Swiss-Prot record:
It comes from the Bacteria. NCBIfam families: S18. This is Small ribosomal subunit protein bS18. Binds as a heterodimer with protein bS6 to the central domain of the 16S rRNA, where it helps stabilize the platform of the 30S subunit. The gene is rpsR. One of its GO terms (biological process) is translation. One of its GO terms (cellular component) is cytosolic small ribosomal subunit. Coiled coil: none annotated. It comes from Stutzerimonas stutzeri (strain A1501). The lineage of its organism: Bacteria, Pseudomonadati, Pseudomonadota, Gammaproteobacteria, Pseudomonadales. Keywords: Ribonucleoprotein, Ribosomal protein, RNA-binding, rRNA-binding. Belongs to the bacterial ribosomal protein bS18 family.
Length: 76
């Protein structure tokens, strides 16, 4: 019987040595947003709590400045 091995989650920001997450770095922020526009939780992405807080703040700032959409599905 084959066993299913789940891939180990790791924090990308810790591995790359990132100090602060910038709200202008849209490519990074888009990786942590679902297709409906919600922020993906850290239990799914493996991001550490410190960086998850920075990520949420950066995404909210980018949304406020209209760099990112609040939702992707407007009346479909």
């Amino acid at each position: 019987m084959a066993r299913f091995f789940r891939r180990r989650k790791f924090c990308r920001f810790t591995a790359e040595g990132v100090k602060e997450i910038d709200y202008k770095d849209l490519n990074t922020l888009k990786a942590y947003i679902s297709e409906t526009g919600k922020i993906v939780p850290s239990r799914i992405t493996g991001t550490k709590a410190r960086y998850q807080r920075q990520l949420a703040t950066a995404i909210k700032r980018a949304r406020y400045l209209a760099l990112l959409p609040y939702t992707d599905s407007h009346g479909r």
